[in-house]
Amino acid sequence: MTKWLLLMVCLGIACQNIRGGVVRENSSGKNLTNTLNVIHKWKYLDYDFDNDERRQAAIQSGEYDRTKNYPLDVDQWHNKTFLAVIRYNGVPSSLNVVSDKTGNGGRLLQPYPDWSFAKYEDCSGIVSAHKIAIDEYERLWVLDSGLVNNTQPMCSPKLFAFDLNTSQLLKQVEIPHDVATTGKGELVSLTVQAMDSTNTMVYMVDNKNTLIIYQNADDSFHRLSSHTLNHNSDKMSDQQENLTLKEVDNKVYGMALSPVTHNLYYNSPSSENLYYVNTESLMKSENQGNDVQYERVQDVFDSQLTVKAVSKNGVLLFGLANNTLSCWNEHQSLDRQNIDVVARNEDTLQMVVSMKIKQNVPQSGRVNNTQRNEYLLALSDRNQNVLNNDLNLEHVNFQILGANVNDLIRNSRCANFDNQDNNHYNHNHNQARHSSKSDNQNNNQHNDQAHHSSKSNNRHNNND
C-alpha cells in the first residue's frame, strides 16, 4: 500500500511512535479492560445487495472485494448507526448505515440514503466519505474527498448535508480548488458548529495542514494557514506487532470541538503536543486578519494523542498509544496530574480511528441504560493488519464500542464538578499557561496566516 493508504486508513493516527512513556493507572483503581462494551463487530464489511446473485455479480466484476473495505468514521442518530468506508477499488458504497441483517462477516451495510448515491460516474454521488458529523439540527454532514484509492481524483471534493428525518439531500457544495489548494481533494478532518440551522460553521483540514472554514449562511469558504497546522515529516516507528513505518507525513487529524469553551482541539498524529484555538476568533478571522490566537500544550501527555471528543460538561476524551483512552476535564488545569486513564484493552483498543459523544443510548449492545444523557461511541480496528493489508477474515477486525460517559469517568480525575463554572475554568486555564505556549506572536512574526474567501458554485435546495 502507498504511504497515503497507510496514513489515511487509520486517519493519520496509526503511526504512533511509542517512546516508552508510561500512562498512569486510573485513579479509581477499577479494572479498565471492560469499561467499553462492544455494540457491533465485523470480521469484514459486507453489504446488503438485496440478493445473492447481485452480490456474486459485484464480486465477479470487482465492485466488491471484502479485503478492501476499511471503516473510517462512525456516528449515530436514534437507531441509525452510520459508517463511512474509504473508497478503494472493491468498495461498493462509502456512506452507509448498519442494517438489521447479518452476514458471515457481521451486520450488513446499506448505502445511505440509497444505492444511487454510491455511484459517482457523473460526480453526483459520494465518491469517498472521509468524515461524517451529525449536528443538533438533525443534519448529517459528509466530507467527500473525491478520491479513489486515496490517490486518484475522480471528482471535485464536496460537502454534503442530509436531512436525517427525511433522508433528503439538503445541500451538495463543491469545494473550490483555490480553497482546497492541493486540487486533489485530500481533505482529512471535519467538525461542525451549529449556532442555529442557518448559522452553521464547518471546519475542515486539507493535507497541506490548512484549516478551511465553510459558512452555511452564505455558502462561503475561507482558509487559515498557521505553522501550528504545519508540521515537518518525522521518522517514526509503530512497535505494535513489530510494524515499522518510516517518513510518514504529519497531518492534522482528530479535531474536537468543546461545547463548553468553544475551543477546537487538534494535533498531528506523531505529536505529543495538543493545540487548540477558540472558534470565536475563527468566526471573525475572515475580516480581522491575523487576530487568531493558537495555543499549544506540551510536555503533558505521555504518548501521542489520536482521536478525541468533548462531552457537554467539558470532559475531553482522547486516545493515546498503548491501547488506552484517557480524559481531562476542562474545568481543571491541563497538566499531568489532572489526566486519567478510563479504558485499556490490548484487543479492542488496538487503534481507535473515530470517536463521538452522543446524547441518546444506542438501541443495541450492552451500554448502560440508567443514564441516557451522553455516551461515547468509538470505532476501532486491528491497526497492524489494516496497515499491512493482511486482515485475517476469520478474526474480528473492526468494532464499534460504547460506554456511558458518566460511568466511564466515575471516580476518575475527570469526574464532573457541578459547582464549577466557566469562570472557574478560565481561572484554572490561565494558571495552566505555564504548560501552554501561545503561538500568536509566532504567527505574526512568521506571517504564516493566509486568508482566502470564495463563493462556491453550489448545487443545493433553497430550504436549508
Swiss-Prot record:
Gene Ontology cellular component terms for the protein in this record: extracellular region
Reported tissue expression: Found in and secreted from the hypopharyngeal glands of the worker honey bee (at protein level); expression peaks at 4 days post eclosion. Expressed in the brains of adult worker bees peaking at 12 days post eclosion (at protein level). Expressed in the spermatheca of adult queen bees (at protein level); Expression levels are higher in mated queens than in virgin queens. Expression in the head of forager worker bees is lower than in the heads of nurse worker bees.
Principal location class: secreted
Renumbered residue ranges of the record's region Disordered: 419-464
Lineage: Eukaryota, Metazoa, Ecdysozoa, Arthropoda, Hexapoda
SUPFAM superfamilies cross-referenced by the UniProt entry: NHL repeat (SSF101898)
Skewed-composition ranges (Low complexity): 438-447
Name this protein carries in UniProt: Major royal jelly protein 4
Keyword list, A-Z: Glycoprotein, Secreted, Signal
Region forming the signal peptide: 1-15
Glycosylation sites: 26, 31, 79, 149, 165, 242, 322, 368
Induction per the UniProt record: Unlike other major royal jelly proteins, not down-regulated by the ecdysteroid 20-hydroxyecdysone (ecdysterone or 20E).
Family per record: Belongs to the major royal jelly protein family.
Alphabetized InterPro entries for the sequence: 6-blade_b-propeller_TolB-like, Royal_jelly/protein_yellow
Localisation per UniProt entry: Secreted
Basic residues bias locations: 426-435
Known function: Component of royal jelly, a substance produced in the hypopharyngeal gland containing proteins, free amino acids, fatty acids, sugars and other nutrients, which is fed to developing larvae by worker nurse bees. Major royal jelly proteins (MRJPs) are high in essential amino acids and probably have a nutritional function in larval food. All larvae are fed some royal jelly (also known as worker jelly) early in their development but it forms the principal source of nutrition for larvae destined to become queen bees.
Residue runs in coiled coils: none
Keyword Secreted included in the entry's annotation: yes
PANTHER family: GH10609P-RELATED, PROTEIN YELLOW-RELATED
